[in-house]
Design a protein with these regions (language model features):
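Conserved GHKL (Bergerat-fold) ATPase module
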Residues: 1-419
């Protein structure tokens, strides 16, 4: 049990720590030159006996303008359930004080493990006092600086090793990038973007890679991304056939990260791979000739509105490249982002259905040469519905009874087909 605060704000709190170090000459008091890699790992195991080996660590040692020693470790997080924020132990002259260091260590660094030891941090005072204390602010800034320097050193000295660690540290770095201006400034050259081929790029490297082929008519570089690679496979492949590159952005934090990059960089615009048909992902002044007449376009439009019945989703008939799928479902970037941000912030969308646009490729042979020319109305509706279901299937939207009916109808057609 430890006491925190003073006067009316003083409270007792029970804590459970993996191990309190009572060694008279603990590792963090030694010079880094005296220590081997195994020494650091052994000390980590002493602190957290049941944890996997850490990814890397930072040895803190400064005596002016404040006194601070310690070792901070980057843990290997196996699952989201491993994320705990009370893993940094605060000591004062080697005497354990607390594991609640949120007023001393920046929030984005609370995922780190380890020990910090400083006699200059005032004890048994209110949190508001701690926040205003000049030593505490300097210590917080120093820790942030050392973490950024360590990350940059790893990136410069062992790029391949840094890339291998990125799945474990990427979310942490992005969080710091978003929440601390000084940290953002220091690590901006070490932030990595991963594409769907598993290649890593810095922000500047990626900008250089795609600028020639993915700059829109307004001079903005269009960054295409997917947050669910398997669900978006057909969209990704279609983009690749046009020579486009696609990023993998599948972490919860990536929604905020994307908007931050758009705001900071100015010449970037991010579009999820299913936010529009492939021909229109990179806006340009080029037009594709329309093969159908106005009345034929109207006929296709009415057919799909009838197939979709009471659906509130928009139907658009567009002239696209003939190799683009006959029917596609796209989810406009702005509306989808707004919905996702509201859900992230805990705002319930109730039973409101997801809004999307059904795009019919009027230049596809199945639309122009077959569907449009069918005289049997029932057969025409069945084919229109089948093409729509294929589009839903490619978006993982065909589920439940609709999926069962789709499978059964295909089995019936196969059984009726002569072999």
């Amino acid at each position: 049990t430890i006491s925190e605060g003073e006067g009316e704000e003083k409270t007792d709190r029970e804590i459970e720590v993996a191990n309190i170090i009572n060694n008279t000459n603990p590792l963090w008091k030694k010079s880094p030159s005296e220590l081997s890699e195994q020494d650091y790992i052994n000390f980590y195991k002493e602190l957290y006996p049941y944890s996997s080996d850490p990814l890397f660590w930072i040895h803190l040692n400064i005596d002016y303008p404040f006194n601070l020693t310690g070792v901070l470790y980057f843990p290997k997080i196996e699952t989201n359930f491993d994320i705990q924020k009370n893993k940094i132990h605060l000591y004062s002259n080697q005497v354990f004080v607390t594991d609640d260091v949120k007023e001393i260590v920046p929030e984005f660094l609370m995922l780190l493990h380890g020990v910090i030891d400083s006699p200059d941090i005032p004890l048994n005072v209110s949190r508001s006092y701690l926040q205003a204390d000049s030593h505490v602010r300097k210590i917080s800034g120093y820790i942030t600086k050392k973490v950024a320097e360590k990350l940059n050193d790893l990136f410069k000295q062992d790029r391949a090793g840094f890339e291998a660690k990125w799945p474990d540290i990427g979310t942490f770095i992005k969080y710091g990038y978003l929440s601390d201006d000084k940290f953002e400034e220091k690590v901006s050259g070490s932030i990595l973007l991963k594409n769907t081929d598993g290649q890593y790029f810095t922000i500047d490297e990626y900008k250089e890679k795609i600028k020639d082929n993915q700059t829109d008519k307004d001079g903005k570089i269009t960054v295409l991304y997917s947050n669910v690679l398997n669900d978006h496979h057909s969209y990704i492949q279609a983009a690749k056939t046009k020579g486009y590159d696609v990023l993998e952005m599948d972490q919860v934090i990536d929604n905020h990260f994307i908007q931050h990059l758009e705001y900071k960089k100015g010449d970037f615009v991010f579009k999820r791979i299913d936010s529009d048909v492939t021909d229109h992902l990179i806006s340009s002044d080029e037009t594709i000739p329309e093969l159908l007449t106005e009345s034929e376009i109207k006929s296709i439009e009415e057919l799909y509105k009838n197939v979709l019945k009471d659906s509130m989703n928009k139907v658009e008939v567009k002239p696209l490249s003939s190799d683009v799928q006959p029917v596609q479902i796209v989810k406009p970037e702005f509306m989808r982002r707004m919905t996702e941000m509201q859900m992230l912030q805990g705002h319930s969308m109730g039973k409101m259905p997801e809004m999307y646009t059904i795009v019919i490729n009027s230049n596809h042979p199945l639309i122009a040469n077959k569907l449009l020319k069918m005289e049997d109305n029932a057969a025409q509706e069945n084919m229109a519905k089948y093409l729509y279901d294929l589009a839903r299937l490619s978006q993982q939207m065909l589920t439940g009874a609709d999926l069962t009916n789709f499978i059964n109808n295909n089995l019936v057609q196969m059984s009726e087909t002569s072999i």
